[in-house]
């Protein structure tokens, strides 16, 4: 009840600010958002969030005594928690720049455990000097890729083949004609890098925070006459552990782990047809909702001191959409695990010491055709999404962190999504 009252107060304040617009010509406030409902049925339980609305990959957990996959079970849901409310503010000139800000909420909350809580999606301010721009606050990660993302029915918006991350950041854009060149310092919030001892501390973002330096991202985008071409690179540093333990006792950990990532994309949009192609390649990009991670490369048995090595993963996607009022579209995605950069430490268990987002998945693919109807402020999309993943099975290879055999898990999802914009 208190959350609902807070929401009403927020809406009331926003509407009050809109009413004051005529009294202060230097400030304008616009309310926007949509009501979204979606119903789906799955054939295989998956790695997911938000009451299974945000589905990544089928999650293989083993077989029963009859040899059947335990997670190969049907489930369904109807939910409105992806509905959204936002406020855009345009303010006075400050430091010679046009100023604006955005604050946007949805009901995603703690997406896995309490997905109906009110939460911040975007909260940022912008200083625009025409040829340069400064963005401070939480918004899409630069690897989201501007306007070049797949058009699908699912809330995952193409993840884990498309980067999905909103984070606090300081981004500086250089605007040169049809080009935008950007540099950003990014910190983590909801979408995080993994660490080995997260359960012992209060915040899951500690791996990146304890790495001290922010993630550094550089990107460039060219946009003209329906053509968009972009590329980017990033580097981050994390601290996998706070402490290590060996035969001589428990000690403060000193080791860090650095990783890099790259992206490239192309989009062409005409009157009725849009095509988007995108690719990502990098190490330990779990904070971008990609599969992968890292593992222990060496360990000193006396002090417990460790070094680490990254898994390298890649993803590609192709999205095509035809039509305006009635639209037909399809998204195709494929990704793979190229293994670790260095050999993993063998502690005698038969498997390496690894963490991340399903680093045992060897490759994955998705096919998602859909049909959409757009009428004024209304949009209806019906989609079939098939996602399949090959999990490592059999003998573990310590030289690269991969497996000798594979076990395939496949989910068939049927979804209908309805949106009303305002």
Please identify what each model-predicted range represents:
Residues 80, 118, 165, 213-215, ...:
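Membrane-spanning beta-strands of outer-membrane beta-barrel proteins
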Residues 70-73, 108-110, 153-158, 195-206, ...:
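Extracellular loop and loop/strand-boundary signature of outer-membrane beta-barrel proteins
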Residues 1-22:
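Bacterial Sec-dependent N-terminal signal peptides
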Residues 406-422:
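Outer-membrane beta-barrel "beta-signal"
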Residues 42-46, 112-114, 145-149, 190-195, ...:
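Outer-membrane beta-barrel proteins
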Residues 224-361, 365:
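Detector for outer-membrane/organellar transmembrane beta-barrel domains
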Residues 377-401:
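C-terminal beta-signal and adjacent terminal beta-strands/loops
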Residues 24-51, 57, 61-192, 212-213, ...:
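Outer membrane beta-barrel
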């Amino acid at each position: 009840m208190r959350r609902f009252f807070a929401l009403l107060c927020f809406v009331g304040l926003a509407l009050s600010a809109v009413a004051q617009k005529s009294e202060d010509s230097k400030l304008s406030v616009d309310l926007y958002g949509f009501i979204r409902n979606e119903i789906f049925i799955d054939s295989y339980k998956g790695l997911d969030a938000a009451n299974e609305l945000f589905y990544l990959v089928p999650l293989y957990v083993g077989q029963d005594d009859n040899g059947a996959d335990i997670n190969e079970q049907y489930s369904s849901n109807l939910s409105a928690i992806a509905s959204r409310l936002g406020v855009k503010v345009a303010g006075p000139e400050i430091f010679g720049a046009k100023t604006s800000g955005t604050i946007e909420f949805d009901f995603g909350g703690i997406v896995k455990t309490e997905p109906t809580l009110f939460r911040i999606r975007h909260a940022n301010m912008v200083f625009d000097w025409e040829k340069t721009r400064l963005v401070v606050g939480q918004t899409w990660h630069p690897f989201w890729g501007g306007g070049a993302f797949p058009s699908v029915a699912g809330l995952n918006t193409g993840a884990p083949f498309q980067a999905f991350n909103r984070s606090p950041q300081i981004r500086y854009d250089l605007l040169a004609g049809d080009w935008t060149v950007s540099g950003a310092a990014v910190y983590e919030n909801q979408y995080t890098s993994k660490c080995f001892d997260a359960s012992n501390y209060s915040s899951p973002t500690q791996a990146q925070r304890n790495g001290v330096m922010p993630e550094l991202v550089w990107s460039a985008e060219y946009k003209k006459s329906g053509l968009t071409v972009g590329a980017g690179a990033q580097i981050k540093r994390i601290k996998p552990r706070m402490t290590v333990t060996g035969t001589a006792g428990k000690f403060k950990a000193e080791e860090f782990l650095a990783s890099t990532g790259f992206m490239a994309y192309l989009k062409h949009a005409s009157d009725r047809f849009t095509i988007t192609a995108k690719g990502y390649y990098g190490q330990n990009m779990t904070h971008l909702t990609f599969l992968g991670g890292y593992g222990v490369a060496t360990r000193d048995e006396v002090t417990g001191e460790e070094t680490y090595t990254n898994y390298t993963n890649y993803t590609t996607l192709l999205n095509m959409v035809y039509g305006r009022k009635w639209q037909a579209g399809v998204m195709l995605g494929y990704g793979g695990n190229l293994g670790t950069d260095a050999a993993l430490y063998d502690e005698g268990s038969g498997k390496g010491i690894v963490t991340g987002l399903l680093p045992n998945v060897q490759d994955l693919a998705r096919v998602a055709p859909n049909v959409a109807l757009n009428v004024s402020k209304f949009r209806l999309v019906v989609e079939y999404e098939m996602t399949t993943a090959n999990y490592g099975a059999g003998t573990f290879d310590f030289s690269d962190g991969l497996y000798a055999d594979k076990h395939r898990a496949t989910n068939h999802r049927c979804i209908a999504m309805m949106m009303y914009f305002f």
